[in-house]
Swiss-Prot record:
Name by which UniProt lists this protein: Ribosomal RNA large subunit methyltransferase I
Origin superkingdom: Bacteria
Signal peptide interval: none
One Gene Ontology molecular-function label: RNA binding
Species name: Salmonella arizonae (strain ATCC BAA-731 / CDC346-86 / RSK2980)
Class of this enzyme: transferase
Domain PUA: 9-88
Residues in coiled coil: none
Keywords, ordered alphabetically: Cytoplasm, Methyltransferase, RNA-binding, rRNA processing, S-adenosyl-L-methionine, Transferase
């Protein structure tokens, strides 16, 4: 397709001086940068983005209900947004995942990581021959049919299941969506393999797309710290860290979560790997309350894993989230024996690594303990971060030695 045969896209005109982020290839246009929309565009429809003088900058998706008014599909003026576009993006992403899966022996991984794979608002996780889809923006939803067609071209033997039941869709003016798209339904619990572990994944009812693939490498790293140690696994979900700790030779692992269903799957995961169930304890409780109760009882641990859910959704919640992270890490530090290890994480995108490190330092001061930072973590390599979109680095963590 030549430029002259392109559709006459509506044009989003930016205010003077507001094109700088696009010139640096950042994929978002915020509402404050917009001067006007020339022409009519439905939510999610493709638009051209131009500066105040009409100079072409990018091609993206219009989202009038969101503070992010447009998300960029391409910075190439000659590239149309069609089925072939999505097919190219999928194949580019698969090339890296194929190498990674072969190298690490994976049958499950993140296939598309949104903006970092050139598909803003699109998340696709692969579990065996199931592709689990999340469409989180108006543009992604508008292109649903094209994206599914591209998936069927690239992965004709895979079933597709939609888990777009995510609250963020409401910010884009969209209803939640969930259910089979093509192929058979996923089983209630699908076994996958990760670094020598067998793990059961609940695609239909589990968190996110069913499992936290981003913590794969952190779960493996846990093994070096746990031999003959007593481990506390907070916010344990379905027990990936617990299974890894048992494979690393821990003396005991206590897994804590508020969901009994998740704890039941965690127990099954221990049994599935033929590990010693007598070394695993499963506690349904609120982590904050339980840590305080442990402190009052004088309980001590050698390793504590702290992997909480996202505490902050927007900037207005950041200060409160900082207090929450500090309190929970302070409690964990107080429960550790001298020389104990705290493995602590934040999956909040607004929480920078530097800020998180400062929070842990403040927590150590409040706990009256010295802490050494000995290892740093981030999301696994199938969750890449494109250089022009630093927000893609959402998961950060530290291994800390508590003196």
């Amino acid at each position: 397709m030549t430029e002259s045969t392109f559709p006459n896209y509506p044009r989003l005109v930016l205010s003077k001086g507001r094109e700088k982020s696009l010139l640096r290839r950042h994929p978002w246009v915020f509402s404050g940068a917009v001067s006007r929309l020339e022409g009519k565009a439905n939510p999610g429809e493709t638009i051209d983005i131009v500066d105040h003088q009409g100079k072409w900058l990018a091609r993206g998706a219009w989202s009038p209900a969101s503070q992010i008014r447009a998300r960029v599909w391409t910075f190439d003026k000659t590239e149309p947004v069609d089925i072939a576009f999505f097919t190219r993006r999928l194949r580019q992403a698969q090339h890296w995942r194929d190498w990674l899966a072969k190298k690490d022996g994976l049958d499950s991984y993140r296939l598309i990581a949104g903006e970092s794979d050139g598909l803003p608002g699109v998340t696709i996780d692969r579990f065996g021959h199931f592709l689990v889809l999340q469409l989180l923006s108006a543009g992604a939803e508008y292109q649903r049919a094209a994206l599914i067609s591209a998936l069927q071209t690239c992965y004709p033997d895979c079933a597709i299941y939609d888990r777009s039941d995510v609250a963020v869709r409401k910010k884009e003016g969209m209803a939640l969506a969930q259910g089979p798209v093509t192929g058979e339904l996923p089983p209630a619990l699908l076994p996958i393999e990760e670094h020598g572990m067998k793990l059961l994944v609940d695609i239909q009812g589990g968190h996110k797309t069913g499992y936290y693939l981003d913590q794969r490498d952190s779960r493996l790293a846990t093994r070096r710290y746990v031999e003959n140690q007593r481990v506390l696994n907070c916010f344990s979900y379905t027990g990936g860290f617990a299974v890894s700790a048992l494979m690393g030779g821990c003396r005991q692992v206590v897994s804590v979560d508020t969901s009994q269903d998740a704890l039941d799957i965690a127990r099954q995961n221990v049994e599935l790997n033929q590990l010693d169930l007598s070394k695993a304890e499963f506690v349904r409780d609120d982590v904050f309350k339980l840590l305080r109760a442990y402190r009052e009882r004088g309980e001590k641990f050698d390793v504590i894993i702290m992997d909480p859910p996202k505490f902050v959704e927007n900037k207005s919640q950041l200060m409160g989230a900082c207090r929450g992270y500090k309190d929970i890490n302070m409690l964990a530090i107080q429960l550790l024996n001298p020389g104990g290890i705290l493995l602590t994480f934040s999956c909040s995108g607004l929480m920078t690594s530097d800020l998180f490190q400062k929070i842990i330092a403040d927590a150590a001061i409040d706990a009256g303990r010295d802490v050494q930072f000995i290892e740093q973590f981030r999301q696994a390599a199938d969750h890449p971060v494109i250089a022009t979109y630093p927000e893609g680095l959402y998961l950060k963590g530290f291994a800390c030695r508590v003196m």
